[in-house]
């Protein structure tokens, strides 16, 4: 059986640009792309924390260290500059692989500078 697990997440990034007439995609600061282990042109899910919108697109590289998170093309209608978003990607793997797999979690500040990384999410308690 193949399972779909969270591969990578950039948590609560701030949308810095929104380009309706660009060719689509989400441009992500190259430093964040690498830290998350995301590839250019990889399918990503975007979850807008500010307005609840959810959509998929593909990632492209923005300038390394720029802090750019730019939602482009038709997807630009789902965000505004300043919105908080979560960028996530999933990977398919066997049960044996899933038993030892840990995702790349990247956390950023309001300027999209990486603050820290992790490979697990704390257990939620009441």
UniProtKB/Swiss-Prot annotation:
GO terms for biological process: alanine biosynthetic process; pantothenate biosynthetic process. SUPFAM superfamilies: ADC-like. Its main location: cytoplasm. The active site is at residues 25, 58. It catalyses: L-aspartate + H(+) = beta-alanine + CO2. Its cofactor is pyruvate. Substrate binds at residues 57, 73-75. Pfam families: Asp_decarbox. GO terms for cellular component: cytosol. Keywords: Autocatalytic cleavage, Cytoplasm, Decarboxylase, Lyase, Pantothenate biosynthesis, Pyruvate, Schiff base, Zymogen. GO terms for molecular function: aspartate 1-decarboxylase activity. The modification Pyruvic acid (Ser) is found at residue 25. Is synthesized initially as an inactive proenzyme, which is activated by self-cleavage at a specific serine bond to produce a beta-subunit with a hydroxyl group at its C-terminus and an alpha-subunit with a pyruvoyl group at its N-terminus. Pathway: Cofactor biosynthesis; (R)-pantothenate biosynthesis; beta-alanine from L-aspartate: step 1/1. Its EC number is 4.1.1.11. It is found in: Cytoplasm. Catalyzes the pyruvoyl-dependent decarboxylation of aspartate to produce beta-alanine. Belongs to the PanD family. PANTHER family: ASPARTATE 1-DECARBOXYLASE (PTHR21012:SF0). Heterooctamer of four alpha and four beta subunits. This is Aspartate 1-decarboxylase. It comes from Xylella fastidiosa (strain M12).
């Amino acid at each position: 059986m193949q399972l779909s697990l969270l591969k990578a997440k950039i948590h609560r990034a701030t949308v810095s640009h929104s380009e309706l007439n660009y060719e689509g995609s989400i441009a992500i600061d190259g430093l964040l792309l690498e830290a998350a282990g995301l590839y250019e042109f990889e399918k990503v899910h975007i979850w807008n924390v500010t307005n609840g919108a959810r959509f998929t697109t593909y990632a492209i590289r923005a300038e390394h260290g720029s802090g750019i998170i730019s939602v482009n093309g038709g997807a630009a209608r789902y965000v505004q500059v300043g919105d908080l978003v979560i960028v996530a990607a999933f990977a398919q793997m066997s049960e044996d692989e899933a038993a030892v797999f840990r995702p790349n979690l990247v956390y950023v500040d309001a300027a999209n500078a990486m603050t820290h990384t992790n490979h697990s999410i704390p257990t939620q308690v009441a």
